[in-house]
């Protein structure tokens, strides 16, 4: 694969495998999965992408002042030095175009970059989210609620990028590496962008957890639903449910779905997404997955299928013990880290479960990451 990224040699760190032919990338991922998981069950071939570039539907760029001019781009790996540019090979091309338009509009407003050492300036970051229809949500991250000229910015950006359907200001006053703060103001539009996965529509805001590769996420979710073998009669738990993506995709195939998520904003979004899709057989609980699962198991809840989609750190021994106590027919584990998946599958194995198969999907070409769906049965 030809390397045409201007920031690759400057080591932005976003695509460490870019110089490696895609076939070899998949082979490396397959070998790692086989080493970690092959002792439990067969590992299917990693399902790659036909076009493994420009797949990210989310972009995060930081602002800086360089040679007296406002610039934005990615950080050089391990630093807070901004590498200017809007031509990332991983981001959807509509996001690259939007990023260039955001910078032009910000310069026209004579806005300044936030200086983290002095604590001065207006702009910290911008976060962009795109939809399957090519619409974009733009979020500006500022240290202070006051953003003079915001109306002029919205007008200028909409003129340069008419596909932008909403502009949000996120306020992050903390001197930390966290990109987003907890407060937001909608400057234009609804404050979200609508996307579709597996026929289900989701509202995506700046802070929503949502898989960044739409094409491969559909592959991943369809495989998870296939392994669940839902017939319309099942009670399903979607643990670590986020904004409800897996659970709401499963709901038309199940009797009822219970989603569990500790982030209150995500639970609110999940409930709104259920209403948006007229899904009446799904409800969402704001609770820590481990604590809720343990309590529900103690109360005698016996779901037919449990979906586990934990963060990179994996699940917990207590959650796995609770799943075992619930005695579901199937557990479908969606993992973003093979090492923690291997650890958790070993924990299930000690409780008498058996991994039936591992189905890897490459959601992150040009990087070392890989997602895997695992079916566990007793």
Label for each model-derived stretch:
Residues 64, 128, 134-143, 201-205, ...:
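Short, aliphatic-rich beta-strand segments
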Residues 57, 136, 233-234:
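Nucleotide donor/acceptor-binding cores
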Residues 73-76, 141, 270:
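Short, acidic/hydrophobic/Gly-rich beta-strand patch recurrent on exposed beta strands
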Residues 5-8, 12-15:
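Short cysteine clusters
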Residues 63-65, 130-132, 362, 378:
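Short, low-complexity Ser/Thr-rich regulatory SLiMs
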Residues 50, 120-132:
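Core structural elements
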Residues 149-378:
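Rossmann-like S-adenosyl-L-methionine
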Residues 2, 16-116, 133, 147:
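Extended interfacial segments that mediate partner engagement and assembly in macromolecular machines
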């Amino acid at each position: 694969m030809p390397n045409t990224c201007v920031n690759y040699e400057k080591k932005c760190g976003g695509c460490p495998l870019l110089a490696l032919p895609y076939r070899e990338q998949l082979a490396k991922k397959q070998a790692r999965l086989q080493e970690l998981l092959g002792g439990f069950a067969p590992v299917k071939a990693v399902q790659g992408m036909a076009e493994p570039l420009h797949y990210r539907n989310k972009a995060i760029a930081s602002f800086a002042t360089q040679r007296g001019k406002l610039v934005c781009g990615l950080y050089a790996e391990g630093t807070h030095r901004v590498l200017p540019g809007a031509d990332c090979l991983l981001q959807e091309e509509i996001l690259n175009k939007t990023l260039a338009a955001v910078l032009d509009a910000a310069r026209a407003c004579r806005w300044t970059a936030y200086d983290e050492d002095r604590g001065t300036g207006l702009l910290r970051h911008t976060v962009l989210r795109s939809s399957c229809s090519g619409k974009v949500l733009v979020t500006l991250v500022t240290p202070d609620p006051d953003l003079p000229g915001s109306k002029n910015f919205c007008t200028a950006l909409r003129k340069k990028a008419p596909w932008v359907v909403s502009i949000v200001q996120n306020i992050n006053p903390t001197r930390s590496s966290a990109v987003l703060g907890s407060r937001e103001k909608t400057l234009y539009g609804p404050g979200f962008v609508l996307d579709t996965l597996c026929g289900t529509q989701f509202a995506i805001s700046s802070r929503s957890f949502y898989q960044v590769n739409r094409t491969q996420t559909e592959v991943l979710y369809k495989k998870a639903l296939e392994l669940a073998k839902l017939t319309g009669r099942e009670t399903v738990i979607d643990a670590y449910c986020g904004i409800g993506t897996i659970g709401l995709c499963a709901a038309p195939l199940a009797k009822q779905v219970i989603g569990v998520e500790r982030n209150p904003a995500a639970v609110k979004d999940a409930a709104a997404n259920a209403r948006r899709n007229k899904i009446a057989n799904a409800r969402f609980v704001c609770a820590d997955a481990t604590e809720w699962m343990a309590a529900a198991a103690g109360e005698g809840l016996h779901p037919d299928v449990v979906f586990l989609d934990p963060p990179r750190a994996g699940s917990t021994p207590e959650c796995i013990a609770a799943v075992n106590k619930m005695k579901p027919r199937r557990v479908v584990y969606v993992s973003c880290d093979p090492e923690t998946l291997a650890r958790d599958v070993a924990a299930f194995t000690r409780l008498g479960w058996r991994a039936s198969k591992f189905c890897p999907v490459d959601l992150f070409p040009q990087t070392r990451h890989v997602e895997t769906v695992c079916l566990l049965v007793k």
